[in-house]
Amino acid sequence: MDRREQKTQQAIRNAFLALRAHKPLERITVKELAENAQISKATFYLHYHDIYELSEALQEDVIQQILSSITQADLFVKDAPAFTRELFASFFAHQHLIDILFSGTQASVLPIRIEQGIREHIFAIVPERRDDAAFNIRLTYQVQGAYYAYSENQRRFGPDAVLAELDGITRSLYA
C-alpha cells in the first residue's frame, strides 16, 4: 500500500470513529463518512464494500491487539488468574476504542470474538482440550462472564476493584 492509500485509509478510519462515537452503526452512511473523510464515495468503495465491512475491520484490529497483548497463548491453561489479569488490562488499555466500536448492537461481538480467538490459540497448542467439557465451559464462563462483570462494573467501582474481584473469583474456580 503506497503513502496515498495509507493516508486515505487513515482518513476513512478516523472519520468513521468520529461518527461512530456519536451515532449508532446503522445510522452512519457512506455519503456522510466520505464527506467527513474528504474523499469521494467511489474512493470509499475502493477500500470497503460497505460501512459494516469497515466496522468489522476496525473491530478485528482491536481484537487482534487485545489477543496479542497476552504474553503466552497458553496462559489460560497454565495460570488462569494471570490470564484474566492480562486480558482485562488489555481491555482497559483499549477502552476508548471498545466503547466506540462495540457499543449498541455491536456490544456482544467483543466477548464472542475474544473467546473464539483464545480457543483457536489454546486448541492449536493443546488440541486434546477441544472435547473437554469442563475446560470449555470454564473458558466460556471466564471470558464471557468476566467481560460482562467488568463492563457493567468498572465505571462504578473502578477497574482495579473489579479486576481484584475477578481475580478472586478465578482463583476460586481453579482451587
What residues fall within each predicted segment?
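Basic, amphipathic alpha-helical hairpins
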Residues: A18-L25, S69-Q72, H94, P127
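Hydrophobic alpha-helical connector segments
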Residues: I70-H96
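Amphipathic alpha-helical packing segments from all-alpha helical-bundle domains
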Residues: T105-T140, Q144, R171
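HTH DNA-binding helix-turn interface
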Residues: A21-L25, Q38-I39, Y45-E56
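Append "Primarily bacterial transcriptional regulators
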Residues: I12, K31-N36, F44, F91
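Short, basic, alpha-helical segments at the C-terminal edge of helix-turn-helix-like DNA-binding modules
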Residues: T29-V30, L58-T71
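Basic, helix-initiating cap at the start of DNA-binding domains
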Residues: M1-L19, K23, R27, N36
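C-terminal peripheral helix-coil segments that are non-catalytic and often amphipathic
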Residues: E152-A175
